Every structure is written in structure tokens, then in C-alpha cells.
Regions:
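Signature of uroporphyrinogen-III synthase
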Residues: 1-258
Length: 258
């Protein structure tokens, strides 16, 4: 048995994931010696099922269906119980696992990382001339993915199966939670903007000093533009294990300073 302290000992982490997706990550943080604080910023709500179901029917014979998140898989399967095409792809391993479970089929996924760019690096998606592709995503999904697929010759249809709804929180509760947190896990650019909107002016300067963990380079740049002092951290993927590793790598030298 080791006498070394837990990897996140002394670290309070604010988890802003939707409530139904936060439990496992919070348990991992606490198992590593940290304290997980919860402040869900967005809820994930389904789009009108009748319209979405019609879009799935029209795309039944498409060559590829590409899913951008596990939420997209979950809501798509709730709406559409039919057979999905043989060409299924996912932008990362967590989405791929959800898609394999929902479809019972093999799924094309990035060889490394979790992003549309990583998926687009796969040889199977290089020449799409004459191919039809359905992107299954959330509202305000990955326009860059659609544009690149079209550049490669594909006819692309995008279907949004869910949308994110900002959740209200009392200003004093937000301020009290932020005072305790040293790091904040952010799930999207929309979530980051909403956190800033929720933060009272009296707590804004303190918020901008927090360490952020974000899902992509785009949100890293957004955080910098919004005035966060420390560069945001972007794990290779937003899986629970990758986020935990990212936090531990950052926190170890910080903890040694105290």
C-alpha cells in the first residue's frame, strides 16, 4: 500500500456537466482525493420528434451517418428505432461506444483523439464523391464538419436531435460555489458564456483566475478572448478518464507549491 497522497488531494473542481452526465466524473474526482462541486449549466432537451423522425427516414439509404456526441446517439435512438446504415461514424471513443451499443454495428472513429478533425483524418472519409452523409448532432452543431465533407464531394444533410437549454442559478449561489472552486470543467462554448452571464460582477475577477478544462482548441481560444488569465486545458478527449488525467497533471505541480 502506498503512502503517497491522492492525485487530487486539496483540489476542489466545479463540474458543470448536465446533471445526468456528472455522476461518474464526480466520483472519480473524489476517489482521487479531490472534492467535486456541481453546477449544471445546461440541460439537454430533445427536438420535436416528428420532424426528426422524418429526416431519419429520408436518410435511411445514405452512405454514412456521423454522430457528434453520445447525446446525439441517445436522442437519435429514442426517436428512431429502425435499422441504421452500415456506414456509422463517431467523432470520439465515448460517442463510438454509445453508437456501437445503440446500433449493434461496427463504428468508424478517430485513431487518436476526439474531434471532427481527427475523424476526418480517417482514410475512409478522404474521397466522398457521390456519397450521401447524414450528420446527427445538436442544435448549433459542427458546421466545419459539414463544410469539409462537402469539399470532399459528399452531399450532406444535418439533423439536430437535441438542443441545450441554459439553466438558471441564483447569483449568490454561483458566487459561493466559485469561491470554493480552483478548477472548472466546461463542456462547450455555450456553457462558458452562460457561466459568465450567471456570475455577478463582484465575482467576475475571481472567476477569470480559475483554471478551466475545456473540450477543444476553439474553447481554449474563447476563454483567452473572454479574459481568463491561465490558458485553458483541453484534454485529448472529454472522457472521464482523460479529464481526470488532465486535472492530475495540472494539479501535481500546483499542490507542490503549497
Amino acid at each position: 500500500m502506498t503512502n503517497e497522497p491522492a492525485g487530487l488531494g486539496g483540489l476542489r473542481v466545479l463540474v458543470t456537466r448536465p446533471a445526468h452526465q456528472a455522476d461518474t466524473l464526480c466520483r472519480l474526482i473524489e476517489r482521487a482525493g479531490g472534492e467535486a462541486l456541481r453546477l449544471p449549466l445546461l440541460s439537454i432537451e430533445p427536438m420535436a420528434p416528428a420532424l426528426v423522425a422524418r429526416q431519419f427516414e429520408l436518410a435511411r439509404a445514405f452512405d454514412w451517418w456521423i454522430f457528434t456526441s453520445a447525446n446525439a446517439v441517445r436522442h437519435a435512438r429514442t426517436i428512431d428505432g429502425g435499422a441504421w446504415p452500415g456506414g456509422l461514424a463517431a467523432v470520439g471513443p465515448a460517442t463510438a461506444a454509445a453508437l456501437e451499443a445503440a446500433s449493434g454495428s461496427d463504428v468508424l472513429a478517430p485513431l487518436q483523439g476526439a474531434s471532427s478533425e481527427a475523424l476526418l483524418a480517417r482514410v475512409e472519409l478522404q474521397n466522398l464523391s457521390g456519397k450521401r452523409v447524414l450528420i446527427v448532432t445538436g442544435a448549433d452543431g459542427l458546421d466545419q464538419l459539414s463544410m469539409e465533407l462537402q469539399v470532399r464531394g459528399a452531399t450532406v444533410v444535418t439533423v439536430a436531435v437535441y438542443h441545450r437549454v441554459p439553466l438558471p442559478h441564483a447569483a449568490d449561489a454561483v458566487e459561493a460555489t466559485l469561491k470554493r472552486a480552483k478548477a472548472i470543467i466546461i463542456t462547450s462554448g455555450q456553457a462558458l458564456e452562460h457561466l459568465l452571464d450567471l456570475t455577478p460582477e463582484s465575482a467576475r475577477a475571481a472567476l477569470l483566475k480559475k483554471q478551466l478544462v475545456v473540450p477543444s482548441g476553439r474553447v481554449v481560444e474563447m476563454a483567452q478572448t473572454l479574459g481568463f488569465a491561465a490558458p485553458a486545458l483541453a484534454p485529448e478527449q472529454m472522457s472521464d478518464a482523460a479529464i481526470l488525467h488532465c486535472l492530475e497533471s495540472w494539479w501535481k505541480p500546483q499542490a507542490q507549491k503549497t
